[in-house]
Swiss-Prot record:
Protein's UniProt name: Large ribosomal subunit protein bL33c
Name of the gene this protein is made from: rpl33
Keyword Plastid: yes
Matching InterPro entries: Ribosomal_bL33, Ribosomal_bL33_CS, Ribosomal_bL33_sf, Ribosomal_zn-bd
Chief localization: plastid
Record flagged with keyword Chloroplast: yes
Length: 65
């Protein structure tokens, strides 16, 4: 039998540029990344700086449900 993953869960990170109306975007839409996190070590929502190809620059990506 296989073990369960335990405290590791899959999360979705969404670009925060959707809130900024004054920036010029390369494409329209919202870009998302998927990642995993350990629920025991990081119970709060994650916020990372990652590259957004729609904005063509590094932006904050926040964890969504």
């Amino acid at each position: 039998m296989s073990k369960s993953k335990g405290a590791r869960i899959v999360i979705t990170l969404e670009c925060c540029c959707r809130n900024l109306n004054n920036i010029t975007k390369k494409k329209s839409g919202i870009f998302r990344y998927t990642s995993t996190k350990n629920r025991k070590n990081t119970p709060n929502r994650i916020e990372l700086m990652k590259f957004c190809p729609y904005c063509n620059k590094h932006q904050k990506f926040r964890e969504i449900k």
